[in-house]
């Protein structure tokens, strides 16, 4: 990767921080406002420069179409972030049998630090650029806030959704207008928060 200019590094850090706080990248207008650019077009130029340097991918047609790009290393040894595949009911998500491989990704690239990668299945979060086959970087925690994108386990299913809670009621909200929210009553249903989404990685070689 070519070195980033100070301004490009600032834009990249803002993208990471926004994903940490809200679970999604910022819009061009938000970047311009937070960094003092005169217009969203100025933010777009910095994003294009980051894309040319291989740091992000710009997805056309969506205001939040920004995705981190990393290259896969050959998994010659079991180091790096574990990639979680299908999760068996009742087993810890990081159980050895769930780990498909490891990626040579620096956990400190994300904030909070990523603890594992989860292969995304389906298009329920497509509106914020989380697509089928993507690798979701996850910080393992049960402490999450309303509005954050989480990895949740409900009965036998592991799902990626936006978290909303009021009292004993939890809503797992999709970012796809064709799908309905999942409503959970904690007084009679078991819901486990496996972690907080802290970034999305797309590897074209895996697609």
Curated annotation (Swiss-Prot):
Keywords: Autocatalytic cleavage, DNA damage, DNA repair, DNA replication, DNA-binding, Hydrolase, Repressor, SOS response, Transcription, Transcription regulation. The record marks 89-90 as: Cleavage. One of its GO terms (biological process) is DNA replication. GO terms for molecular function: DNA binding; serine-type endopeptidase activity. Residues 28-48 bind DNA. InterPro entries: LexA, LexA-like, LexA/Signal_pep-like_sf, LexA_DNA-bd_dom, LexA_repressor, Peptidase_S24_LexA, Peptidase_S24_S26A/B/C, WH-like_DNA-bd_sf. CDD domains: S24_LexA-like. Its EC number is 3.4.21.88. It comes from the Bacteria. It catalyses: Hydrolysis of Ala-|-Gly bond in repressor LexA. The active site is at residues 124, 161. SUPFAM superfamilies: LexA/Signal peptidase (SSF51306), Winged helix' DNA-binding domain (SSF46785). Gene3D superfamilies: Umud Fragment, subunit A, Winged helix-like DNA-binding domain superfamily/Winged helix DNA-binding domain. Represses a number of genes involved in the response to DNA damage (SOS response), including recA and lexA. In the presence of single-stranded DNA, RecA interacts with LexA causing an autocatalytic cleavage which disrupts the DNA-binding part of LexA, leading to derepression of the SOS regulon and eventually DNA repair. PANTHER family: LEXA REPRESSOR, LEXA REPRESSOR-RELATED. Belongs to the peptidase S24 family. Homodimer. This is LexA repressor. It comes from Aeromonas hydrophila subsp. hydrophila (strain ATCC 7966 / DSM 30187 / BCRC 13018 / CCUG 14551 / JCM 1027 / KCTC 2358 / NCIMB 9240 / NCTC 8049).
């Amino acid at each position: 990767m070519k070195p980033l200019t100070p301004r490009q590094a600032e834009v990249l850090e803002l993208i990471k921080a926004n994903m940490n706080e809200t679970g999604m990248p910022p819009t061009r207008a938000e970047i311009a406002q937070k960094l003092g650019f005169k217009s969203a077009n100025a933010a777009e130029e910095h994003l294009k420069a980051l894309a040319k340097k291989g740091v992000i991918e710009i997805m056309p047609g969506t205001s939040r179409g920004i995705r981190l790009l990393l290259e896969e290393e050959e998994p010659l040894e079991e180091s790096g972030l574990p990639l979680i595949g299908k999760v068996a009911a009742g087993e810890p998500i990081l159980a050895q049998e769930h780990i498909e491989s490891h990626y040579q990704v620096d956990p400190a690239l994300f904030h909070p630090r990523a603890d594992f990668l989860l292969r995304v299945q389906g298009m329920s979060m497509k509106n914020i650029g989380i697509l089928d086959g993507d690798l979701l970087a996850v910080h393992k925690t049960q402490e999450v806030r309303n509005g954050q994108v989480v990895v949740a386990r409900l009965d036998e299913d592991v799902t990626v959704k936006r978290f909303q809670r009021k009292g004993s009621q939890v809503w797992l909200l999709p970012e796809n207008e064709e799908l309905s929210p999942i409503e959970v009553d904690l007084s009679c249903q078991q819901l486990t928060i496996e972690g907080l989404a802290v970034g999305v990685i797309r590897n074209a070689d895996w697609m």
